Amino acid sequence: MLKRLLIVLTSLALMTGGMDPAGSFRIEEIPDEIFESMQGRSFNEPAPVKREDLRLLTVLYTDFEGCTQKGQIICNKKIADDLIDIFRELYENAYPIESIRLIDEFDGDDKASMRADNTSCFNVRPKSSSRSGFSSHAYGMAIDINPLYNPYVRTRDGVTRIEPEEAAPYVDRQKDFPHKIDSQDLCCRLFRAHGFTWGGAWRSVKDYQHFEKSLN
């Protein structure tokens, strides 16, 4: 109830400041200054997508302190409407997200972004599970939510790899702790309802932060 009240009060403050909260959830083509900042960070050649395939989203979200924040996401235009709908509903339900910042603010460093528990989408990089091929993030078709509490986990030849490494306390999904995404979590249910696959349901690896949609 308190979080919902904070959202209402913040929305009123936005309106008195002359900005329509509904307009805070919007989709636009990638502005020149944003695309320039992506060079050598999230956008590296060869890239599997072009600038015109991408969209910049602006969303509101509730942070871990229960306060309203504004975030930005770059994604493939094919999932832009899905993400706007999902993040609007997450916000309306005061779903806590620690950070939503463009990964370019971390110089395109996925590990640094995850350590900061930053939610992000587009980033031209290889698959985590192999040295060849692009990650679905490179197409802007995947997003990671609260990654510090929902790590990538892979065990091979008796060796367990955790990303980010700082997420080791959250690998045991039988434990109860805040910000854990499971199959009954609102975030998971919303993404699945929009046709996304959840990495936490994979067999060979577990990627609890990860939601992706097929490009085709």
Q: Can you name each region flagged by the protein language model?
A:
Residues 2-8:
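Sec-dependent signal peptide recognition
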Residues 56-59, 86, 90, 122, ...:
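Generic structural hydrophobic/aromatic packing signal, biased to beta-strands
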Residues 20, 49-54, 115, 136-138, ...:
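A generic structural signal for short, non-catalytic loop/turn and secondary-structure boundary residues
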Residues 10-14:
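Hydrophobic core
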Residues 99-141, 147-152:
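Active-site-adjacent loop/helix surface patches within enzyme catalytic domains
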Residues 20-67:
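N-terminal module-boundary/linker segments of secreted carbohydrate-active enzymes
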